[in-house]
Amino acid sequence: MGKRPPIPPDIENGPPPPARPHFRPPIPVPWVAWLVPLILAANFVTFATTMYVNDCPARSDECLLFDVLGRLSFQPIKENMLLGPSIPTLRKLGALERRLVEEGERWRLISCIWLHGGFLHLMANMISLMCIGMRLEQEFGFMRIGALYVISGLGGSLVSCLTDSQGERVSVGASGALFGLLGAMLSELITNWTIYENKCTALMTLILIIVLNLSVGFLPRVDNSAHFGGFLAGFFLGFVLLLRPQYGYVNPKYIPPGYDMKHKKSKHKCYQHIFRFTSLAILLAGFIAGYTKLLREHTIQSMPFRDFN
């Protein structure tokens, strides 16, 4: 009686210091993919225009599906097994042919990736574009994927020209650009290796897809040199454009007050920067050397796929 209760030690020592705030970085919002569907639509419109210009009924009585398609009907199977136009029409509209490129028509290095040899050729490429391109655009945005598509297509066209010793091969198609997207997927996996969970599974699956697609290029009348050139261009460009922040990085604008900045992680790892600048140097050197060889009318004599085109 008359005794005061003991003072709790926490009152004497004051309130405990506030715990370091714990938070999760905001989940990135995926991009809305509109460029890939636009490219797909452009390819279909270009093919329809090609068939209209081709006008098979004006030159042949054996046009395929004339009753249904009329002027847009296909050349006879003996001329084009892919259900498409004639070679002169493709040449007229911008197909890649080294002889014409050397005569000053450099625009064919780009225009050829929007043309296709036939409806079957078009559908195969567009299905691949939807499967590969949509996911990449949702993750990395239209600017980087658009640059990848065009530059890879240009790289494929350049290698195709350089491996054509006769200068008379006519080449069309978006395959070089599509292989560039595959190459970029591989380099993206390598440079962002630390953020993947099932690393080996993802790598082996991607390599299997790439090998299967490259093996198709050894079939007759397939320009595998364009596939190879596009793949290389996309592979090196992927190191430049498709870097992801390392796990645990948070943009400074999302960091709450009171957070210990000593624990803040850098956006990219050192090896990512090394890959980026090395790949950019290789890419620029390759394009400059290739274009210089083309202007000087040189050919690449030691490519393993030259005889399969």
UniProtKB/Swiss-Prot annotation:
One Gene Ontology cellular component: membrane
Superkingdom of source: Eukaryota
Chief site of localization: membrane
InterPro entries given in the database record: Peptidase_S54_rhomboid-like, Peptidase_S54_rhomboid_dom, Rhomboid-like_sf
Subcellular location: Membrane
Keywords from the named record: Hydrolase, Membrane, Protease, Serine protease, Transmembrane, Transmembrane helix
Biological processes, Gene Ontology terms: proteolysis
Topology in the lipid bilayer: Multi-pass membrane protein
EC number: 3.4.21.105
Reactions accelerated catalytically: Cleaves type-1 transmembrane domains using a catalytic dyad composed of serine and histidine that are contributed by different transmembrane domains
Location of the active site: S175 (nucleophile), H227 (charge relay system)
Single GO MF annotation: serine-type endopeptidase activity
Residue ranges of the TM segments: 27-47, 113-133, 140-160, 170-190, 200-220, 222-242, 274-294
Role of this protein: Probable rhomboid-type serine protease that catalyzes intramembrane proteolysis. May function in reproductive organs maturation.
Protein family membership: Belongs to the peptidase S54 family.
Name of the protein described by the UniProt record: RHOMBOID-like protein 5
